[in-house]
Amino acid sequence: MSSPEAVRTVHVYSMHTDPFAQPGSGDAGGMNVYIAQSVRAMLTINPQLKVEVFTLNRTPQAPERAHVEDPEWGSRLVRHYIDVPAAREATKNDLAEYLEDFAQSCVTQAMNVPDVVHAHYWLSGWAAVQADGVWSRRLFPGRVPDGADGSGSSDGSGEHRLSTRAVAIFFTPHTTAAAKDARRGPGEPTEPRIRHSIENRLPAFVDGYIVNTPLEAEELVQSHPSLSGRISIITPGVDTDIFRPLPGVHPDHDTSETRCRIVFAGRPQPLKGPHLLVEALALLPRDLQVELDIIGRSESDYEQRLLERAAELGLADQVRLKDPVPPEELARIFRSADIVACPSSSETFGLVALEAQACGAAVLASDVDGLRFAVENHRTGLLVAPRTAERWAVAIERLVRAPYLRHSLGANAAARARSMSWESTARKTLDVYETAVPVPRPAET
């Protein structure tokens, strides 16, 4: 493969979540935005490209048809909704039980044989390996040895699969079990054993990894030396047509040194940390009037527990829970916020932080992995460590009492975001696809 046009068909696997679902609800978040935006940008760059996206049909809102053409891109972007009835009520961590069914359906429902499969998250990564075994048996009968589809043993080098593969596989983890467990905070569950097992095996079966930051790449190579030279670092982008400052539009309490509205946007769950913000508000000096808007839903009892805790702390009138909103409305909320807070225990990048900065918002974020790259400390936002309510209270008070600092951080952040586009992300991703060794195909295919 020597030019972007050499890759004609890409299959994107996102087993556990629909990339085109509303971010901030259920399992939909930054990964969904990343996939949807990069796919659309790739289609713009390469007019010959066709993309098929595969996801489980897990919600009542999913189309009843097995596949739908995208309203904007038509047959160039087809969304496949794989129906595995038993998986509809399963939690994300229980979906591994249905990997084989999902992988088989990805092959049987495909409209074209892919040149590349790009799998997102550990479930999809293993589904891609299993699907490659199905493609291999279909395209090259009798040629697939034990272990080529992940079913047997491997020495970790990947030589078995790479010598017999039917398609090139690229994998973006978005998170890893090892990283999440190492950074998890109090009350956050450990990752399931099967996830650790699969993520330890994946390096032997994929052509390459695509990650967001140098830290992510470094940690992967430390855990899996065989990945050295097979990891590409591609920074996510931001849609600055939507997420941008507007002339004459200012935060709600633009010049106040005592009043402030904080916005948290994302799925409310322990690892995202909105509970830290509730606890921090209770520690602020009494002369400060600080409100917190939590934008998102997690389909659990976590939100109710947040509201109950706020009431216990006397903050019932200061903490509000709101439904997730479309990008245009989210951008409006960011522009009106005095502070946007991202108190996660771990993020591979932190798209919410980047989108908020693109709107000119002052951002507070945990000083952890990917957020260190999304936010330039003391220039486009402030990083908070350690990840405690006490430290977050100190950081919030600092920004509330310094409107000039909020203005400076927001201006620098908006300027930086203008240089980070999804077009750049997509172009680099297409270049990585081209590094795969082409697979000779039988003449009849």
Report residues per predicted region.
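Glycosyltransferase donor-sugar binding loop
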Residues: 291-307
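Carbohydrate-associated surface elements
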Residues: 215, 237
